[in-house]
Amino acid sequence: MNLQDKYEAIFASAKPKILTEKTYFDRLIDDVNDKRSGITLLIRPNRVVVEKINEVLSDFKKIEPQQYYYPDTDIHVTGLSIISCYPDFDYRSIDINQYIEVIKQSLKNCKPFSLNFRGLTASLDCVMCKGFYDNSTLDLIRNNLRKDFLKTSLQQSLDKRYTLETAHSTILRLRAPLQDKKAYIEVIEKYKEYDFGTW
């Protein structure tokens, strides 16, 4: 299944459930006692792309102001989650330089690539920009990271939650019941093929 088909399948599955209030809420977003942390290799979009995302988010804010909107500094594509977030993770327990060296090794000889955010999709708890990449470099980087970290004794939890195959960016997360389910779906569909830009 190609990326477009994956994104379409996610929304096709979620849409009827959203309209019948079968959504999920992230109850930890506002929890001051949430101490989970981990290590993730992130890919950040440029300023132009982020500004376009904010323009789209402003449409959602008009109808769903109580939801969680990612700040500019948190908008990203996950390259790969090296250590999945968990409550007792302590950065002082690892040598971060060793992780940096493995990542550098994984990136060595990889060609440049571009990412394009084109359109929105949604699951039961969030709205995402659909990300597309122009060659196989991102897949190669992810596979290199998996292979190179598995050769070490470093703490890691690669693909523990799921095997990452997309290049999406979550930009809105539900933290309360939707006030207007129909309008929410309409905004998603309005921007279903919107070109946020390439970087």
Feature locations, PLM:
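Histidine-dependent nucleotide/RNA phosphoesterase domain, centered on the 2H-phosphoesterase fold
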Residues: 1-199
